[in-house]
């Protein structure tokens, strides 16, 4: 355990940030999974609706620094290509 007061504060802050990041990543996975399931089902309308939600979550996660902005762009691009192939 840390002995310095500021280190103790950082441990708590880092834990809160970690929990927040895990929650954001979990939401991302859920949104992307919903989009991929709609694509697999061949339902273009549902896939586009799910993509809109997933793209918004990816952009927010990238803006918050949870994922890199290039990773968000690559994931959005991959989903868009799959939807356009329907």
From Swiss-Prot:
GO terms for biological process: translation. GO terms for cellular component: cytosol; small ribosomal subunit. Gene3D superfamilies: Ribosomal protein S20. Keywords: Ribonucleoprotein, Ribosomal protein, RNA-binding, rRNA-binding. The keyword Ligase does not apply. One of its GO terms (molecular function) is structural constituent of ribosome. It comes from the Bacteria. It holds the Pfam family Ribosomal_S20p. HAMAP family: Ribosomal_bS20. Binds directly to 16S ribosomal RNA. Belongs to the bacterial ribosomal protein bS20 family. This is Small ribosomal subunit protein bS20. It comes from Bifidobacterium longum subsp. infantis (strain ATCC 15697 / DSM 20088 / JCM 1222 / NCTC 11817 / S12).
